[in-house]
């Protein structure tokens, strides 16, 4: 009988729409790495802006609460993983208080970014969500880049990389977390 890992290390892959988060984390999951679980923030469902405003007081508040819920779920470790990889659009400032409060000892936050023209092409093309290619998304991407720079978070530019290449680079981040297991014990 396999015993569950107490609390997994968590790799947060954040970024704006079209940066390649979902595709890369899906590809990472396809590698079926031992002890690694891949999770998608939006799989919980994303309510309309109106519902976010009515029930949470706005999108920012919804994002903060859902980030906390995700971290609580991952810490509970229902899938018995050693490393949980969560991709989504959230602020590092929402991640850090929850990981401290919940006692997450091993985590990394990685920004997946790309040039605006590439993001726009991805959203209009394969994603078929051209409505997300706008000034607001560009501002969100710039905000996340600024936060990553200010907090000295690693940034992975997916502009000229294939999904498989980005997944390989994410695997390297998983290996870094796996290697830190002995240091945290």
Describe each model-derived feature in a short phrase.
Residues 2-8:
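Phosphate-binding P-loop
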Residues 13:
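Hydrophobic anchor at the beta1->P-loop junction of P-loop NTPases
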Residues 17:
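The conserved Walker
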Residues 22:
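Walker A/P-loop
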Residues 25-72:
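Conserved substrate/cofactor phosphate-moiety recognition/catalytic segment
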Residues 62-106:
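Glycine-rich phosphate-binding loop used to anchor ATP phosphates in small-molecule kinases
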Residues 88, 104-125:
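Conserved phosphate-donor/acceptor-positioning beta-strand/loop module used by diverse small-molecule
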Residues 129-169:
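Small-molecule kinase domains that catalyze NTP-dependent phosphoryl transfer to phosphate-bearing small molecules
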């Amino acid at each position: 009988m396999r015993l569950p890992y107490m609390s997994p290390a968590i790799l947060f892959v954040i970024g704006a729409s079209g940066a390649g988060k979902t595709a890369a984390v899906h590809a990472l999951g396809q590698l079926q790495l031992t002890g690694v679980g891949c999770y998608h923030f939006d799989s919980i469902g994303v309510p309309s802006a109106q519902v976010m405003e009515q029930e949470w007081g706005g999108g920012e508040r919804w994002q903060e609460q859902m980030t906390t819920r995700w971290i609580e779920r991952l810490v509970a470790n229902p899938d018995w993983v050693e490393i949980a990889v969560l991709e989504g659009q959230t602020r590092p400032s929402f991640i850090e208080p929850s990981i401290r409060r919940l006692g997450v000892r091993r985590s990394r936050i990685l920004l997946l970014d790309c040039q605006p023209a590439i993001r726009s092409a991805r959203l209009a093309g394969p994603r078929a969500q051209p409505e997300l290619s706008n000034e607001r998304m560009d501002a969100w991407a710039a905000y996340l880049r600024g936060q990553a720079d200010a907090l000295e978070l690693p940034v992975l530019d997916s502009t000229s990389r294939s999904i498989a290449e980005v997944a390989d680079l994410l695997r390297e981040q998983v290996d870094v977390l796996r290697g830190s297991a002995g240091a945290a014990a």
